[in-house]
Design a protein with these regions (language model features):
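Charged, low-complexity intrinsically disordered terminal segments
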Residues: 1-524
Length: 524
Protein backbone atom coordinates (compact mmCIF):
# COMPACT_ATOMS: atom_id res chain seq x y z
CA UNK A 1 0.00 0.00 0.00
CA UNK A 2 1.37 3.42 -0.98
CA UNK A 3 1.46 6.16 1.65
CA UNK A 4 -0.55 9.20 0.57
CA UNK A 5 1.99 11.70 1.90
CA UNK A 6 4.81 10.01 0.03
CA UNK A 7 2.69 10.09 -3.11
CA UNK A 8 2.22 13.84 -2.71
CA UNK A 9 5.88 14.72 -2.24
CA UNK A 10 7.82 12.22 -4.34
CA UNK A 11 8.36 12.24 -8.10
CA UNK A 12 6.28 9.89 -10.22
CA UNK A 13 8.23 7.78 -12.75
CA UNK A 14 7.28 10.15 -15.59
CA UNK A 15 8.50 13.11 -13.52
CA UNK A 16 12.02 11.68 -13.16
CA UNK A 17 12.56 12.46 -16.82
CA UNK A 18 14.80 9.47 -17.52
CA UNK A 19 13.08 6.50 -19.19
CA UNK A 20 16.47 4.83 -19.66
CA UNK A 21 16.84 3.72 -16.04
CA UNK A 22 15.42 0.58 -14.46
CA UNK A 23 15.29 2.11 -11.01
CA UNK A 24 11.63 3.18 -11.27
CA UNK A 25 10.54 -0.29 -12.32
CA UNK A 26 11.67 -1.85 -9.07
CA UNK A 27 9.77 0.03 -6.38
CA UNK A 28 6.32 0.02 -4.81
CA UNK A 29 2.94 0.56 -6.47
CA UNK A 30 3.91 3.79 -8.22
CA UNK A 31 7.36 2.45 -8.98
CA UNK A 32 9.31 5.60 -8.15
CA UNK A 33 10.05 5.21 -4.44
CA UNK A 34 10.30 2.42 -1.88
CA UNK A 35 8.52 2.18 1.47
CA UNK A 36 9.40 0.06 4.49
CA UNK A 37 12.86 1.44 5.21
CA UNK A 38 14.65 2.57 8.35
CA UNK A 39 16.64 5.79 7.92
CA UNK A 40 19.08 7.11 10.51
CA UNK A 41 20.70 10.52 9.91
CA UNK A 42 24.38 10.62 10.87
CA UNK A 43 25.58 14.12 11.73
CA UNK A 44 29.36 14.71 11.61
CA UNK A 45 32.05 12.80 9.78
CA UNK A 46 33.28 11.12 12.98
CA UNK A 47 29.81 9.64 13.54
CA UNK A 48 29.64 8.31 9.99
CA UNK A 49 33.16 6.87 9.98
CA UNK A 50 32.54 5.04 13.25
CA UNK A 51 29.35 3.45 11.92
CA UNK A 52 31.07 2.56 8.65
CA UNK A 53 33.90 0.89 10.57
CA UNK A 54 31.47 -1.06 12.77
CA UNK A 55 29.61 -2.44 9.76
CA UNK A 56 32.65 -3.21 7.62
CA UNK A 57 34.57 -4.89 10.44
CA UNK A 58 31.68 -7.33 10.99
CA UNK A 59 31.77 -8.72 7.42
CA UNK A 60 32.84 -12.25 6.61
CA UNK A 61 33.89 -14.22 3.52
CA UNK A 62 31.13 -14.22 0.91
CA UNK A 63 29.77 -10.81 1.91
CA UNK A 64 29.93 -7.89 -0.51
CA UNK A 65 30.87 -4.21 -0.44
CA UNK A 66 30.20 -1.70 -3.21
CA UNK A 67 31.25 1.95 -2.99
CA UNK A 68 31.51 5.13 -5.03
CA UNK A 69 33.43 8.28 -4.13
CA UNK A 70 34.72 11.63 -5.36
CA UNK A 71 37.94 11.44 -3.34
CA UNK A 72 39.51 8.66 -1.29
CA UNK A 73 42.60 8.88 0.92
CA UNK A 74 43.83 5.40 1.79
CA UNK A 75 45.35 6.63 5.06
CA UNK A 76 42.24 8.43 6.39
CA UNK A 77 41.50 7.06 9.86
CA UNK A 78 37.98 5.86 10.58
CA UNK A 79 38.56 6.11 14.35
CA UNK A 80 40.96 8.36 16.31
CA UNK A 81 43.53 5.56 16.65
CA UNK A 82 42.75 3.87 13.35
CA UNK A 83 42.38 1.73 11.38
CA UNK A 84 42.45 3.55 8.06
CA UNK A 85 39.86 3.11 5.33
CA UNK A 86 42.55 1.62 3.09
CA UNK A 87 43.51 -0.97 5.70
CA UNK A 88 39.90 -1.96 6.39
CA UNK A 89 39.03 -2.45 2.72
CA UNK A 90 42.33 -4.24 2.06
CA UNK A 91 41.68 -6.69 4.90
CA UNK A 92 38.16 -7.33 3.63
CA UNK A 93 39.32 -8.08 0.10
CA UNK A 94 42.01 -10.40 1.45
CA UNK A 95 39.54 -12.30 3.62
CA UNK A 96 37.09 -13.26 0.89
CA UNK A 97 34.73 -10.27 0.93
CA UNK A 98 33.96 -9.01 -2.56
CA UNK A 99 34.98 -5.34 -2.78
CA UNK A 100 34.05 -3.27 -5.84
CA UNK A 101 34.55 0.48 -6.13
CA UNK A 102 34.02 3.35 -8.55
CA UNK A 103 36.34 6.28 -7.82
CA UNK A 104 36.33 9.42 -9.90
CA UNK A 105 39.57 9.52 -11.88
CA UNK A 106 39.87 13.21 -10.89
CA UNK A 107 42.34 15.85 -12.11
CA UNK A 108 45.88 16.75 -11.10
CA UNK A 109 46.69 17.59 -7.50
CA UNK A 110 48.38 20.74 -8.85
CA UNK A 111 44.84 21.97 -9.63
CA UNK A 112 43.67 21.17 -6.06
CA UNK A 113 42.07 17.87 -7.11
CA UNK A 114 42.90 14.32 -6.07
CA UNK A 115 44.11 12.19 -8.98
CA UNK A 116 47.11 10.92 -7.01
CA UNK A 117 45.10 10.05 -3.89
CA UNK A 118 42.38 8.23 -5.80
CA UNK A 119 44.95 6.31 -7.81
CA UNK A 120 46.78 5.25 -4.63
CA UNK A 121 43.60 3.93 -3.03
CA UNK A 122 42.56 2.11 -6.20
CA UNK A 123 46.02 0.59 -6.67
CA UNK A 124 46.24 -0.62 -3.08
CA UNK A 125 42.87 -2.36 -3.27
CA UNK A 126 43.39 -3.84 -6.72
CA UNK A 127 46.67 -5.39 -5.56
CA UNK A 128 44.84 -7.56 -3.01
CA UNK A 129 41.98 -8.78 -5.19
CA UNK A 130 39.43 -5.99 -4.99
CA UNK A 131 38.27 -4.32 -8.18
CA UNK A 132 38.29 -0.52 -8.11
CA UNK A 133 37.87 1.51 -11.28
CA UNK A 134 39.04 5.08 -11.91
CA UNK A 135 35.97 6.37 -13.71
CA UNK A 136 36.06 9.44 -15.97
CA UNK A 137 32.84 8.75 -17.90
CA UNK A 138 31.54 12.27 -17.34
CA UNK A 139 30.85 15.27 -19.53
CA UNK A 140 33.64 17.78 -20.11
CA UNK A 141 34.56 19.58 -16.85
CA UNK A 142 32.29 17.23 -14.92
CA UNK A 143 33.04 14.84 -12.08
CA UNK A 144 31.67 11.76 -10.35
CA UNK A 145 30.51 13.23 -7.06
CA UNK A 146 28.36 10.36 -5.74
CA UNK A 147 29.21 9.03 -2.26
CA UNK A 148 27.76 5.59 -1.55
CA UNK A 149 28.49 2.42 0.42
CA UNK A 150 26.31 -0.66 -0.03
CA UNK A 151 27.02 -3.50 2.43
CA UNK A 152 25.48 -6.91 1.70
CA UNK A 153 25.51 -10.06 3.84
CA UNK A 154 25.42 -13.49 2.20
CA UNK A 155 22.29 -15.31 3.34
CA UNK A 156 21.18 -12.47 5.62
CA UNK A 157 19.51 -9.72 3.57
CA UNK A 158 17.88 -8.36 6.73
CA UNK A 159 21.35 -7.15 7.79
CA UNK A 160 22.06 -5.29 4.55
CA UNK A 161 22.41 -1.53 4.63
CA UNK A 162 23.67 1.48 2.71
CA UNK A 163 25.32 4.77 3.57
CA UNK A 164 24.50 7.80 1.39
CA UNK A 165 25.51 11.40 1.95
CA UNK A 166 28.06 14.12 1.46
CA UNK A 167 31.06 12.63 3.28
CA UNK A 168 34.06 11.50 1.24
CA UNK A 169 36.58 8.86 2.37
CA UNK A 170 39.28 11.46 2.74
CA UNK A 171 41.22 13.83 4.93
CA UNK A 172 39.40 16.66 6.71
CA UNK A 173 36.04 14.86 7.00
CA UNK A 174 36.42 13.24 10.45
CA UNK A 175 35.24 16.09 12.64
CA UNK A 176 32.70 15.94 15.49
CA UNK A 177 30.31 18.22 17.40
CA UNK A 178 33.19 20.19 18.96
CA UNK A 179 34.32 21.22 15.47
CA UNK A 180 38.03 21.35 16.13
CA UNK A 181 38.76 19.77 12.75
CA UNK A 182 40.05 16.43 11.50
CA UNK A 183 43.58 15.69 12.83
CA UNK A 184 44.33 14.69 9.23
CA UNK A 185 43.76 18.05 7.48
CA UNK A 186 43.84 18.97 3.80
CA UNK A 187 44.83 22.25 2.10
CA UNK A 188 42.10 24.85 2.53
CA UNK A 189 41.38 28.57 2.63
CA UNK A 190 43.74 29.88 5.36
CA UNK A 191 40.87 31.61 7.17
CA UNK A 192 39.65 28.19 8.34
CA UNK A 193 42.91 27.56 10.22
CA UNK A 194 45.34 24.65 10.07
CA UNK A 195 42.59 22.11 10.88
CA UNK A 196 39.39 23.19 9.18
CA UNK A 197 36.29 22.73 11.37
CA UNK A 198 33.94 20.66 9.21
CA UNK A 199 30.16 20.16 9.33
CA UNK A 200 28.81 17.22 7.34
CA UNK A 201 26.04 14.62 7.21
CA UNK A 202 25.09 11.21 5.82
CA UNK A 203 22.26 8.67 6.07
CA UNK A 204 22.36 5.07 7.25
CA UNK A 205 19.59 3.20 5.43
CA UNK A 206 18.14 -0.29 5.90
CA UNK A 207 15.31 -1.89 3.98
CA UNK A 208 14.35 -2.63 0.39
CA UNK A 209 15.59 0.71 -1.00
CA UNK A 210 19.12 -0.66 -0.52
CA UNK A 211 18.36 -2.55 -3.73
CA UNK A 212 17.71 0.71 -5.61
CA UNK A 213 20.97 2.14 -4.34
CA UNK A 214 22.85 -0.96 -5.47
CA UNK A 215 21.16 -0.68 -8.89
CA UNK A 216 22.56 2.85 -9.15
CA UNK A 217 26.05 1.39 -8.63
CA UNK A 218 25.36 -1.43 -11.11
CA UNK A 219 24.19 0.94 -13.85
CA UNK A 220 27.51 2.76 -13.72
CA UNK A 221 29.58 -0.43 -13.42
CA UNK A 222 27.86 -2.03 -16.41
CA UNK A 223 28.35 1.01 -18.67
CA UNK A 224 30.30 -0.41 -21.60
CA UNK A 225 31.97 2.84 -22.63
CA UNK A 226 35.71 3.33 -21.97
CA UNK A 227 36.50 4.51 -18.45
CA UNK A 228 38.72 7.30 -19.75
CA UNK A 229 40.04 8.88 -22.91
CA UNK A 230 42.15 6.44 -24.93
CA UNK A 231 45.49 8.27 -24.78
CA UNK A 232 48.90 6.73 -24.05
CA UNK A 233 49.18 8.69 -20.80
CA UNK A 234 45.78 7.56 -19.54
CA UNK A 235 46.54 3.95 -20.47
CA UNK A 236 49.76 4.13 -18.41
CA UNK A 237 47.84 5.58 -15.44
CA UNK A 238 45.36 2.71 -15.61
CA UNK A 239 48.18 0.15 -15.77
CA UNK A 240 49.90 1.72 -12.75
CA UNK A 241 46.64 1.56 -10.81
CA UNK A 242 46.34 -2.13 -11.77
CA UNK A 243 42.92 -1.43 -13.19
CA UNK A 244 41.46 -4.32 -15.18
CA UNK A 245 41.15 -3.57 -18.88
CA UNK A 246 37.84 -5.41 -18.88
CA UNK A 247 36.02 -5.18 -15.52
CA UNK A 248 34.48 -8.42 -14.37
CA UNK A 249 30.69 -8.63 -14.58
CA UNK A 250 28.94 -8.16 -11.28
CA UNK A 251 27.69 -11.37 -9.66
CA UNK A 252 24.02 -12.18 -9.46
CA UNK A 253 22.52 -9.89 -6.87
CA UNK A 254 21.31 -11.07 -3.50
CA UNK A 255 17.57 -10.57 -2.87
CA UNK A 256 16.57 -7.05 -1.82
CA UNK A 257 16.42 -6.60 1.95
CA UNK A 258 13.02 -7.04 3.65
CA UNK A 259 11.06 -4.12 5.16
CA UNK A 260 12.84 -2.60 8.15
CA UNK A 261 10.92 0.50 9.20
CA UNK A 262 8.35 3.24 8.48
CA UNK A 263 10.30 5.46 6.10
CA UNK A 264 9.67 5.95 2.38
CA UNK A 265 12.81 6.72 0.36
CA UNK A 266 13.23 7.98 -3.19
CA UNK A 267 16.63 7.66 -4.85
CA UNK A 268 17.52 10.80 -6.81
CA UNK A 269 20.41 11.26 -9.22
CA UNK A 270 22.09 13.75 -11.51
CA UNK A 271 23.87 12.69 -14.68
CA UNK A 272 25.03 15.30 -17.18
CA UNK A 273 24.00 15.13 -20.82
CA UNK A 274 27.02 13.94 -22.80
CA UNK A 275 28.11 12.14 -25.93
CA UNK A 276 28.27 9.20 -25.96
CA UNK A 277 25.40 9.12 -23.51
CA UNK A 278 25.03 6.92 -20.48
CA UNK A 279 23.16 3.72 -21.43
CA UNK A 280 20.97 4.21 -18.34
CA UNK A 281 20.50 7.98 -18.92
CA UNK A 282 20.84 8.77 -22.66
CA UNK A 283 19.78 12.40 -22.16
CA UNK A 284 21.21 12.63 -18.66
CA UNK A 285 19.12 12.67 -15.50
CA UNK A 286 18.12 15.63 -13.36
CA UNK A 287 15.79 14.02 -10.83
CA UNK A 288 17.62 15.83 -7.99
CA UNK A 289 16.60 19.19 -9.46
CA UNK A 290 13.09 18.01 -10.31
CA UNK A 291 12.54 16.70 -6.79
CA UNK A 292 13.49 20.05 -5.28
CA UNK A 293 11.20 21.84 -7.73
CA UNK A 294 8.28 19.66 -6.68
CA UNK A 295 8.97 20.00 -2.96
CA UNK A 296 9.37 23.78 -3.16
CA UNK A 297 6.09 23.91 -5.06
CA UNK A 298 4.37 22.29 -2.06
CA UNK A 299 6.20 24.22 0.68
CA UNK A 300 4.03 26.42 2.88
CA UNK A 301 5.79 26.93 6.23
CA UNK A 302 9.56 26.39 6.32
CA UNK A 303 12.43 25.52 3.99
CA UNK A 304 15.67 24.78 5.83
CA UNK A 305 18.89 24.28 3.84
CA UNK A 306 22.46 23.42 4.77
CA UNK A 307 24.68 23.63 1.72
CA UNK A 308 28.23 24.14 0.55
CA UNK A 309 27.38 26.74 -2.10
CA UNK A 310 23.87 28.13 -2.76
CA UNK A 311 24.89 29.33 -6.20
CA UNK A 312 22.95 30.44 -9.29
CA UNK A 313 19.61 32.08 -9.88
CA UNK A 314 18.47 28.96 -11.74
CA UNK A 315 18.77 26.89 -8.56
CA UNK A 316 17.32 29.61 -6.29
CA UNK A 317 14.33 30.22 -8.56
CA UNK A 318 12.23 27.42 -7.05
CA UNK A 319 12.61 28.85 -3.53
CA UNK A 320 11.95 32.35 -4.89
CA UNK A 321 8.68 31.19 -6.46
CA UNK A 322 7.66 29.43 -3.25
CA UNK A 323 8.23 32.63 -1.27
CA UNK A 324 6.07 34.63 -3.66
CA UNK A 325 3.33 32.00 -3.62
CA UNK A 326 3.21 31.44 0.16
CA UNK A 327 3.24 34.60 2.33
CA UNK A 328 3.75 32.54 5.51
CA UNK A 329 6.82 30.71 4.21
CA UNK A 330 10.17 31.24 5.95
CA UNK A 331 13.56 30.20 4.55
CA UNK A 332 16.69 29.55 6.65
CA UNK A 333 19.96 28.74 4.86
CA UNK A 334 23.34 27.77 6.36
CA UNK A 335 26.45 28.06 4.15
CA UNK A 336 30.23 28.36 4.68
CA UNK A 337 31.54 31.81 5.59
CA UNK A 338 34.20 31.69 2.90
CA UNK A 339 34.71 29.59 -0.25
CA UNK A 340 37.10 26.66 0.17
CA UNK A 341 39.44 28.38 -2.28
CA UNK A 342 39.25 32.17 -2.07
CA UNK A 343 42.29 33.54 -3.85
CA UNK A 344 42.45 36.51 -6.19
CA UNK A 345 41.39 34.29 -9.10
CA UNK A 346 39.40 31.51 -7.40
CA UNK A 347 37.30 33.62 -5.03
CA UNK A 348 35.33 35.98 -7.29
CA UNK A 349 33.70 33.27 -9.48
CA UNK A 350 32.53 31.45 -6.34
CA UNK A 351 31.11 34.60 -4.80
CA UNK A 352 29.48 35.67 -8.07
CA UNK A 353 27.04 32.75 -8.08
CA UNK A 354 26.14 33.10 -4.40
CA UNK A 355 25.58 36.86 -4.60
CA UNK A 356 23.08 36.33 -7.42
CA UNK A 357 21.19 33.57 -5.60
CA UNK A 358 20.97 35.32 -2.23
CA UNK A 359 19.92 38.61 -3.81
CA UNK A 360 17.10 36.85 -5.67
CA UNK A 361 15.73 35.30 -2.48
CA UNK A 362 16.02 38.38 -0.29
CA UNK A 363 14.34 40.59 -2.86
CA UNK A 364 11.45 38.14 -3.13
CA UNK A 365 10.66 38.21 0.59
CA UNK A 366 12.41 40.82 2.73
CA UNK A 367 12.40 39.68 6.34
CA UNK A 368 11.42 36.10 5.51
CA UNK A 369 14.83 34.78 4.41
CA UNK A 370 17.81 34.29 6.70
CA UNK A 371 21.27 33.27 5.48
CA UNK A 372 23.81 32.29 8.14
CA UNK A 373 27.24 30.75 8.56
CA UNK A 374 28.86 28.91 11.48
CA UNK A 375 31.87 29.15 13.78
CA UNK A 376 33.18 27.06 16.66
CA UNK A 377 33.62 28.31 20.22
CA UNK A 378 37.14 29.47 19.41
CA UNK A 379 35.78 31.76 16.70
CA UNK A 380 37.12 29.72 13.78
CA UNK A 381 34.64 29.47 10.90
CA UNK A 382 33.12 26.02 10.32
CA UNK A 383 33.12 24.83 6.72
CA UNK A 384 29.60 23.66 5.89
CA UNK A 385 29.84 20.61 3.65
CA UNK A 386 26.49 19.05 4.65
CA UNK A 387 23.83 18.80 1.95
CA UNK A 388 20.53 18.81 3.83
CA UNK A 389 17.15 20.25 2.85
CA UNK A 390 14.05 19.97 5.06
CA UNK A 391 10.66 21.19 3.84
CA UNK A 392 7.70 21.67 6.20
CA UNK A 393 9.11 19.04 8.57
CA UNK A 394 7.77 16.38 6.19
CA UNK A 395 10.14 15.81 3.25
CA UNK A 396 13.91 15.98 3.52
CA UNK A 397 16.98 15.17 1.49
CA UNK A 398 20.56 14.25 2.28
CA UNK A 399 23.14 13.25 -0.28
CA UNK A 400 25.98 14.47 -2.44
CA UNK A 401 24.26 17.26 -4.38
CA UNK A 402 24.88 20.93 -3.70
CA UNK A 403 22.58 23.83 -4.43
CA UNK A 404 24.28 24.86 -7.65
CA UNK A 405 23.84 24.31 -11.35
CA UNK A 406 26.80 21.91 -11.55
CA UNK A 407 25.21 19.51 -9.04
CA UNK A 408 21.74 19.75 -10.54
CA UNK A 409 22.75 19.30 -14.19
CA UNK A 410 26.39 18.28 -14.76
CA UNK A 411 28.18 16.06 -12.21
CA UNK A 412 26.99 12.63 -11.15
CA UNK A 413 25.14 13.00 -7.84
CA UNK A 414 23.24 10.68 -5.52
CA UNK A 415 20.72 11.89 -2.94
CA UNK A 416 17.90 10.29 -0.99
CA UNK A 417 14.59 12.03 -0.34
CA UNK A 418 12.80 10.70 2.75
CA UNK A 419 9.23 10.86 4.08
CA UNK A 420 8.20 9.33 7.41
CA UNK A 421 5.07 7.24 6.72
CA UNK A 422 4.20 6.77 10.38
CA UNK A 423 0.70 7.97 11.31
CA UNK A 424 0.15 11.71 10.82
CA UNK A 425 0.62 12.67 14.47
CA UNK A 426 3.83 10.67 14.74
CA UNK A 427 5.73 11.77 11.61
CA UNK A 428 8.92 12.78 13.34
CA UNK A 429 11.99 11.95 11.29
CA UNK A 430 12.34 15.22 9.36
CA UNK A 431 11.47 17.27 12.44
CA UNK A 432 13.89 15.35 14.65
CA UNK A 433 16.68 15.90 12.12
CA UNK A 434 15.96 19.63 12.04
CA UNK A 435 15.92 19.87 15.84
CA UNK A 436 19.19 17.93 16.08
CA UNK A 437 21.14 20.31 13.86
CA UNK A 438 19.37 23.41 15.22
CA UNK A 439 20.21 22.42 18.79
CA UNK A 440 23.89 22.32 17.89
CA UNK A 441 23.88 25.51 15.82
CA UNK A 442 21.84 27.58 18.29
CA UNK A 443 23.30 26.14 21.50
CA UNK A 444 19.83 25.31 22.86
CA UNK A 445 18.03 22.11 23.84
CA UNK A 446 15.75 20.37 21.38
CA UNK A 447 12.88 20.71 23.85
CA UNK A 448 13.21 24.50 23.89
CA UNK A 449 13.11 24.60 20.09
CA UNK A 450 10.31 22.11 19.51
CA UNK A 451 7.36 24.48 19.91
CA UNK A 452 8.65 27.32 17.71
CA UNK A 453 6.61 28.17 14.64
CA UNK A 454 8.57 29.25 11.52
CA UNK A 455 8.31 33.05 12.10
CA UNK A 456 9.50 32.65 15.69
CA UNK A 457 12.25 30.28 14.55
CA UNK A 458 13.64 32.73 12.00
CA UNK A 459 13.45 35.49 14.61
CA UNK A 460 15.43 33.30 17.04
CA UNK A 461 18.10 32.60 14.44
CA UNK A 462 18.37 36.30 13.65
CA UNK A 463 18.62 37.31 17.32
CA UNK A 464 21.17 34.58 18.08
CA UNK A 465 23.42 35.72 15.24
CA UNK A 466 22.98 39.37 16.23
CA UNK A 467 24.00 38.62 19.83
CA UNK A 468 27.25 37.03 18.68
CA UNK A 469 27.91 39.89 16.25
CA UNK A 470 27.35 42.41 19.06
CA UNK A 471 29.71 40.49 21.36
CA UNK A 472 32.49 40.76 18.80
CA UNK A 473 31.69 44.43 18.15
CA UNK A 474 32.00 45.08 21.88
CA UNK A 475 35.49 43.62 22.08
CA UNK A 476 34.43 40.14 23.28
CA UNK A 477 33.64 41.40 26.78
CA UNK A 478 31.92 38.94 29.11
CA UNK A 479 30.81 35.41 28.35
CA UNK A 480 30.50 34.43 24.71
CA UNK A 481 26.82 34.14 23.70
CA UNK A 482 25.57 30.63 22.98
CA UNK A 483 25.47 29.20 19.50
CA UNK A 484 27.54 28.85 16.35
CA UNK A 485 25.67 31.12 13.96
CA UNK A 486 26.64 34.43 12.42
CA UNK A 487 24.78 36.47 9.84
CA UNK A 488 26.28 35.54 6.46
CA UNK A 489 27.61 38.36 4.31
CA UNK A 490 29.04 37.38 0.94
CA UNK A 491 31.96 39.64 0.07
CA UNK A 492 30.84 41.82 -2.86
CA UNK A 493 32.65 42.02 -6.18
CA UNK A 494 33.97 45.11 -7.90
CA UNK A 495 32.69 45.82 -11.40
CA UNK A 496 35.99 44.67 -12.83
CA UNK A 497 35.90 41.42 -10.84
CA UNK A 498 32.34 40.72 -11.97
CA UNK A 499 33.34 41.33 -15.58
CA UNK A 500 35.83 38.47 -15.68
CA UNK A 501 34.36 36.30 -12.90
CA UNK A 502 31.02 35.74 -14.63
CA UNK A 503 32.32 33.82 -17.68
CA UNK A 504 34.61 31.72 -15.47
CA UNK A 505 31.71 30.99 -13.14
CA UNK A 506 29.37 29.94 -15.96
CA UNK A 507 31.86 27.90 -17.97
CA UNK A 508 34.07 26.25 -15.32
CA UNK A 509 32.83 26.67 -11.75
CA UNK A 510 29.11 26.10 -12.30
CA UNK A 511 28.58 24.67 -15.81
CA UNK A 512 25.22 23.78 -17.30
CA UNK A 513 24.99 20.07 -18.12
CA UNK A 514 21.47 20.11 -19.56
CA UNK A 515 20.72 19.28 -23.20
CA UNK A 516 20.97 22.38 -25.40
CA UNK A 517 17.19 22.50 -25.90
CA UNK A 518 16.73 23.20 -22.18
CA UNK A 519 19.53 25.66 -21.56
CA UNK A 520 17.60 28.81 -22.40
CA UNK A 521 14.74 27.74 -20.16
CA UNK A 522 14.25 27.29 -16.44
CA UNK A 523 13.39 23.62 -16.95
CA UNK A 524 15.30 20.56 -15.83
Amino acid sequence: MTDQTAGTWFLRPDERGNPGTDIDRMGDVDGSWVEGNLVRPLIHGATYFRRLYEELSALRAGDRVYFTDWRGDADEKLLPDGPTIGAVLTDLAGSGVEVRGLLWRSHSDHLRFSARENRKLGTRLNQVGAEVLLDQRVRWLGSHHQKLFVVRHAGHPERDLAFVGGIDLCHQRRDDHDHLGDPQPAPMNHRYGDRTPWHDAALEIRGPVVGDLLRTFCERWDDGHPLDRRTPYRMIVQRLARMPRHPKPLPESFPDPPPAGPHAVQVLRTYGHKRPGYPFAPEGERSVARAYEKAFGIARDLIYVEDQYLWSELVAQGIHDALERSPALRVIVVVPRYPDADGALSGPPSRFGQLRAVRLLQRAAPGRVGVFDLENEEGTPIYVHAKICIVDDTWFTCGSDNFNRRSWTCDSELTCAVVDTTGTDARRLARDLRLEVWSEHLGLTRESLAALDPPAALDLWTRTAAALDAWYAGGCQGARPAGQIRAHRTEPLSRFQALWAEPLYRLIYDPDGRPHRLRRSAEF
